[in-house]
């Protein structure tokens, strides 16, 4: 037989929604927007690293970081 604990009582509401699925696509579009924004962020970082995106007064030489 399982024993009731205070932590179990606190976490029980989180588990009460187990197995329930929202109808339709739900919030999939929100996830798609955030994935798109993250992709753009990574693309900008890659372009700065490759010096394809030139920014004024920003030197990407890693040797300058040791000074």
From Swiss-Prot:
Q: Write out the GO MF terms.
A: phosphate ion binding
A GO cellular component annotated for this chain's UniProt record is:
photosystem II
What does the UniProt entry say about where the protein is found? Cellular thylakoid membrane
- Membrane topology, from the record: Single-pass membrane protein
Annotated signal sequence is none
Domain of life, source organism = Bacteria
Name the keywords, alphabetized: Membrane, Photosynthesis, Photosystem II, Thylakoid, Transmembrane, Transmembrane helix
Instruction: Locate the transmembrane regions by residue number.
Output: 29-49
A Pfam family this chain is assigned to: PsbH
Question: Where's it mainly located?
Answer: membrane
Listed under GO biological process in this entry are: photosynthesis; protein stabilization
The record's family statement is: Belongs to the PsbH family.
Subunit-level organization: PSII is composed of 1 copy each of membrane proteins PsbA, PsbB, PsbC, PsbD, PsbE, PsbF, PsbH, PsbI, PsbJ, PsbK, PsbL, PsbM, PsbT, PsbX, PsbY, PsbZ, Psb30/Ycf12, peripheral proteins PsbO, CyanoQ (PsbQ), PsbU, PsbV and a large number of cofactors. It forms dimeric complexes.
Q: Could you tell me what this protein does?
A: One of the components of the core complex of photosystem II (PSII), required for its stability and/or assembly. PSII is a light-driven water:plastoquinone oxidoreductase that uses light energy to abstract electrons from H(2)O, generating O(2) and a proton gradient subsequently used for ATP formation. It consists of a core antenna complex that captures photons, and an electron transfer chain that converts photonic excitation into a charge separation.
Task: Please give the name of this protein.
Answer: Photosystem II reaction center protein H
Organism listed in the record: Trichodesmium erythraeum (strain IMS101)
Q: Which gene encodes it?
A: psbH
């Amino acid at each position: 037989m399982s024993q009731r604990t205070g932590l179990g009582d606190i976490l029980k509401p989180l588990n009460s929604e187990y197995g329930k699925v929202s109808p339709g696509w739900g919030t999939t579009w929100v996830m798609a927007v955030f994935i798109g924004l993250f992709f753009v962020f990574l693309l900008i970082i890659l372009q700065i690293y490759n010096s394809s995106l030139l920014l004024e007064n920003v030197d990407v030489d890693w040797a300058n970081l040791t000074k």
